[in-house]
């Protein structure tokens, strides 16, 4: 289903962004 795929892609994208932000947050030590 197109909508399901779209939602899954967005979810994966947001999780990826959150992971990157988390890594950056760790690197800054704050």
UniProtKB/Swiss-Prot annotation:
Protein family according to the UniProt entry: Belongs to the glucagon family.
Q: What superkingdom does the record give?
A: Eukaryota
Q: Where is this protein found? A: Secreted
The answer to whether keyword Lipid metabolism applies is: no
Please provide one cellular component term from the Gene Ontology annotations of this protein.
extracellular region
Q: For the modification Arginine amide, which residues carry it?
A: 30
Q: What is its main location?
A: secreted
Stored Gene3D superfamilies: 6.10.250.590
Name listed for the protein in its UniProt record: Glucagon-like peptide
The entry's keywords: Amidation, Secreted
Q: Name one GO molecular function term.
A: glucagon receptor binding
Q: Which organism is it from?
A: Anguilla anguilla
One of the GO BP terms on file? response to starvation
